[in-house]
Amino acid sequence: MKKTQTWIITCIYLQLLLFNPLVKTQEICRNPVTDNVKDITKLVANLPNDYMITLNYVAGMDVLPSHCWLRDMVTHLSVSLTTLLDKFSNISEGLSNYSIIDKLGKIVDDLVACMEENAPKNVKESLKKPETRNFTPEEFFSIFNRSIDAFKDFMVASDTSDCVLSSTLGPEKDSRVSVTKPFMLPPVAASSLRNDSSSSNRKAAKSPEDPGLQWTAMALPALISLVIGFAFGALYWKKKQSSLTRAVENIQINEEDNEISMLQQKEREFQEV
């Protein structure tokens, strides 16, 4: 009985061992953007217009492909949001400044984790370092929303294009973020975050986050581990049945031998009489 339990436990752990790493990998890069980004409008309204938020701004954000600056930008956004969070007290519930910033920080942290797992390869990066600047809440969260919007295209972005700023790009063209338009949440804060625009729909077939591909990738190792578990169970059952059959045969042989011995003993006693 103990051996049977041992085999069952072994099969279960084998399935978990094969299945769990893939699930973990899939979870890291699922879309981390939630409806919490809709609260940015309220947060910007709560902060003074002259309140300055420090951010290491990645040069070339306005002229380079998103995969060139997105990884560094979300990392710097995470640092700035953490610093901003420390300036508020967690004393109120609901949509307080603290809770909004905390939720936005968690979104960015998930983006950072995904960037680390899927860093572009063979990319010639610019040697220009990020510049530390101060932004108003309106400017800062415009950059935040733009970074989230760029994340949608990150998985299908080119891994080979260079990320070097052109020599004709002067510091005047990249020294500030354009905020000539009134602050508005881009479509990313609403419908674009979930079931996106036509451009993302065109890329869905190639995207590694296609639901069909995800389920296939998750089901395949689970099926393999299940088959292996049943195979081990079948082998053990066959071995157990063989042992039981031999044991029954041995018992029957012993009983027959005992009966023969008893008959022979009675026959000798009868002859003696």
Swiss-Prot record:
Cytoplasmic compartment spans: 238-273
Site, Not glycosylated: residue positions: 97
Positions of the UniProt region annotated as Disordered: 190-211
Pfam families linked: SCF
Glycosylation site residues: 90, 145, 167-168, 180, 195
SUPFAM superfamilies on file: 4-helical cytokines
InterPro entries assigned: 4_helix_cytokine-like_core (IPR009079), SCF (IPR003452)
Sections of the chain in a coiled coil: none
Extracellular topological domain: 26-214
Bilayer-crossing regions: 215-237
Pyrrolidone carboxylic acid modified-residue sites: 26
A Gene Ontology cellular-component term: cytoskeleton
Keywords for this protein: Cell adhesion, Cell membrane, Cell projection, Cytoplasm, Cytoskeleton, Disulfide bond, Glycoprotein, Growth factor, Membrane, Pyrrolidone carboxylic acid, Secreted, Signal, Transmembrane, Transmembrane helix
Gene Ontology MF term list: cytokine activity; growth factor activity; stem cell factor receptor binding
Secretion signal, residue range per the UniProt entry: 1-25
Gene Ontology annotations of biological process type: apoptotic process; cell adhesion; cell population proliferation; ectopic germ cell programmed cell death; embryonic hemopoiesis; extrinsic apoptotic signaling pathway in absence of ligand; hematopoietic progenitor cell differentiation; male gonad development
Family stated for the protein in its record: Belongs to the SCF family.
PANTHER family: KIT LIGAND (PTHR11574:SF0)
Assembly notes: Homodimer, non-covalently linked. Heterotetramer with KIT, binding two KIT molecules; thereby mediates KIT dimerization and subsequent activation by autophosphorylation.
Protein name: Kit ligand
Source organism (scientific name): Rattus norvegicus
Lineage of origin: Eukaryota, Metazoa, Chordata, Craniata, Vertebrata
Gene assigned in the entry: Kitlg
